[in-house]
Amino acid sequence: MYKQAGDEKENKLLSVVHSLLFSIHETELQDFVRGQCTGSCIRHLLVKLLRYSGYDAAVCVSKWQGFDKIPGGDHEYIDVIIDNDLTGPERLIIDIDFRSHFEIARAVDPYGTLLDSLPVVYVGTLPRLKQFLNVMVDAAKWSLKQNSMPLPPWRSLSYLQMKWHSKYERKGLHSEQQEFQGASPSHALCFGHLKRLKSSLRLELETGRLLMMPVMQAGTKRTAMYERRRRRSLLSF
């Protein structure tokens, strides 16, 4: 599932996001302390670094009212506006904690494998994001059914779509920079979040390299075989 790669612009932005996240040190998060942070400091700093890199990036906060059996809520993520000469500006979504949206109780092994195949950080369009949501909601229903458990409202397709499809406020760089006076309990969680994020990204990239090795080795063998045949052909003249 993770191999559903985006286009060139998405892949380039994904590479930039990975590099910037690896470059962040926990001491840099101090400028964005603001109460219960829940990773907001990481997102604001990433937006700052993306803007320095020339991207039109912003933190987006979506909010929605509950309806029927769907609870209300809010969500914070990042978007980047990319110029497209053919279709006009294109909006790409960045979610730095993507897998957490699909975690469920007592998940069966196949679901856990599918969850681990998701990108650690999502970078892409809303239509491609919706494809992920559809697949994961169906898989979650099946997994929960194996344990005779219902799908909770906050894992329904309607609720998940509200996170990125609801009306949102696009914010610039966080202006309320505060002096860091030690790691508060809430902000200390962000240090752990950043550490786990980097660790997961390293594992993802390493796994990707291992998966590519057989393909690269096969390509090398084909090249070597072609070269031997070419040389024999030249020597036969």
Which ranges hold each PLM region?
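Short acidic loop-to-beta-strand element that houses the catalytic metal-binding Asp/Glu
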Residues: G72-D95
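Interdomain/boundary linker segments immediately adjacent to catalytic/signaling cores
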Residues: M1-R51
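Catalytic cores of nucleic-acid endonucleases
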Residues: D97-M162
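Intrinsically disordered, low-complexity regions enriched in proline, serine, glycine
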Residues: V59-V61, K69-I70, R91-D95, E103-R106, ...
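Conserved beta-strand elements of beta-rich interaction domains across eukaryotes
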Residues: A57, S62-Q65, D83-T87, D97-H101
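Acidic, Ser/Thr-rich intrinsically disordered and amphipathic helical segments
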Residues: K12-S19, C41, L45, I93, ...
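Eukaryotic intrinsically disordered, low-complexity regulatory regions enriched in Ser/Thr/Pro
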Residues: V123, S156-F237
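A short acidic/basic microdomain associated with nuclease active sites
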Residues: R51-V80
